[in-house]
UniProtKB/Swiss-Prot annotation:
Listed name of the protein: UPF0401 protein c5157
InterPro entries the record matches: DUF905 (IPR009253), YkfF-like_sf (IPR038612)
Organism: Escherichia coli O6:H1 (strain CFT073 / ATCC 700928 / UPEC)
Similarity comment: family membership: Belongs to the UPF0401 family.
Length: 77
């Protein structure tokens, strides 16, 4: 197994910097609906289908996204 470790979010709301770390680490995670102060983080599966998305300010946003990052996230090489 490689030394790649999943990049996860805090269990609650997350910052733009935290979202950028995740989008940099994964090929299939994107920021959408960027309103400046708030935005959605979106995860697609390997086939490109939407798996999950959350606004960055949701109280349990990271808790909702982290299982999908761990199971569906495609780490960049």
């Amino acid at each position: 197994m490689s030394d790649c470790h999943p990049v996860l979010l805090p269990e609650g709301p997350f910052s733009r910097e935290q979202a950028m770390a995740v989008t940099t680490a994964y090929r299939n995670v994107l920021i959408e609906d960027d309103q400046g102060t708030h935005f959605r983080l979106v995860i697609h599966n390997a086939e490109g289908q939407l798996r999950w998305r959350c606004w960055n300010f949701e109280p349990d946003a990271g808790k909702q996204l982290n299982p999908y990052l761990a199971s569906e996230g495609i780490l960049r090489q």
